[in-house]
Amino acid sequence: MLNRIMISELAFPALLVGGALAFEQLMAPARVLFGQVSDRWKIGGLRRTPYIWLGTAGFCTLATLSIPVIFATSSALSSGSTTSITAWVMALCGLFALYGVAISSASTPYLALVIDLTDEQERPRVVGIIWCMLTVGIIVGAIAISISTRSLDDVTDPAVLQSTLQGFMNRVALVIGSIVLLATVGIEPKQAKGKADGESGRNKKDVTLKQSWALIRSSRQILIFFCFLLCFTLGLFLQDPILESYGAEVFGMEIRQSTMLNAFWGCGTLAGLLIAGLWFTPRFGKLSSARTGCWMILASLLLLIAAGLTGSIGTLLVVMVLFGLSAGIGTNSALSLMLDLTIPQLAGTFVGVWGLAQAMSRALGKVMGGGLLDLGRFLSNSDQPLQAFSFVFVIEAGVVLIAIALLNRLNTAQFRRDTETRMDILLMANLDD
C-alpha cells in the first residue's frame, strides 16, 4: 500500500521508492548476526523468544513512524529545497534500515525456533502451516486496508491521506504486537539458569562465528542454494513495488481496488501452500516441487502482460490467483529445502544465511523494480504504461529461468556429507584445545 501511495498519489520517483524500501533488506547481514547470537546466548533461560519480542517491539514502533516521515519527505520534494530533500530522504532510508534490523531480530530466531521444535519429517507440513497463516494475514491485511482506505478514493489532499493512514498504522502495530506476544509465550521450553548457562558456555566454546563461517563455506552446495534462493525470491518479488501502480495506471484501479490485488494473490498462495504441503511436495519431492513452482511463476509473469493487453480487471484478478498458487507451491518446497540444508547445532546461523539470501533479493527487487520501471518508461518513450511494466515482467521471467538452472545443480545429500565432515573436524579441534 505504501509504495502505491508514494508512487501514484504523492508522485515519488519509482526509483526513490524502491531504493528507500530496499534499505529494509540491505540490513540482511544482521540476520546472520542475530542467528549466531540466538545460538550462543540465552536471555532468562530462553534462546529464541526474547529476540523475537524485542524485534517485534522495534518494527511495530517504526511502522507507526513511517507515515509522518513519508509525508514529510513528500513536502520536502514539493519544496524543491536540496537541503530539505536530502535530509528527509536520508531519514526515510534510515527508518527503513532500522525496520530491517528489527525484522531480522524477530524473524531469524523465529525460524531457528521452528527447527529446534521439529524434525525433518515434520518440517514440510510445519512450513506449510506457517506460510498459510502468513498468507491469511496478507489476505486479512489487504481486506482491512481496502476497507480502511475506501474513503480515500479520489482524495488528493495529503493531510487527509496522512491522517487516515496514521490511524490505521497505529491500530495495525498494536494488533500485530499483541498477536506475536500471545503466539510465542510459553512455546519455547525454559531451562534452569545453571543448565542454560552451562550449555551456553559449551556452545560458545564449540563453534565460534569464525568457525561457523568456515563451515558455511565448506560446501559448494551452500553457494548453489544461496544463489537459487536469491534468484527465486527476486523472480517472485521483482514486481512487488510496482504491482499496485500497474493496477492503477494500466487498469485504472482506485486505491482500495489495487490493494485487493494482494488479497487475490494471497488466496492463490494459500491454496498453493496447502496443495504443496499436504500433497504435492510429499508425493513428488522437494526438488521437483520447487522446479514446478518456478515454471508456474514464469508462466504467471507472462500472463500478467497478457492481462494488461486485455485491460480487463477480472482477467488481472484471475492471473493474480494463479500467480499466488504458483508462489505457494514454489515457496513451500523452497523453504522445506532451506530447513533441510541446515544443521541443528547451528540452526540460527544457517537460517540467518538463508534469510540473508532472501533479504538481499528482496532489496534488489525493490530497487530494480522501481528502477526498471523508470528505465522502461524511458526506453518505450510512450504514453502507454503497459510497455514499461511489461519490460519489468520480462526481466523478472529471465531471473526465474536462472533459478531453475541453479536448482538443477542442487544436491542435498552432498550438502550433508560436506557439512557433517567439517562439523566433526571443528568439534574434534575444540576438544583438542
Please identify what each model-predicted range represents.
Residues A14-L15, V89-M90, E120-I129, I255-R256, ...:
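Loop-to-transmembrane helix entry/capping segments in MFS-fold secondary transporters
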Residues W53-I85, W295-G311:
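C-terminal ends and interior cores of transmembrane alpha-helices
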Residues L2-L16, P241-S258:
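Short amphipathic helix-loop junctions that connect adjacent transmembrane helices
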Residues T83-A97, S105-A106, Y110-L111, L117-L230, ...:
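Intracellular loop-helix junctions on the cytosolic face of multi-pass helical membrane proteins
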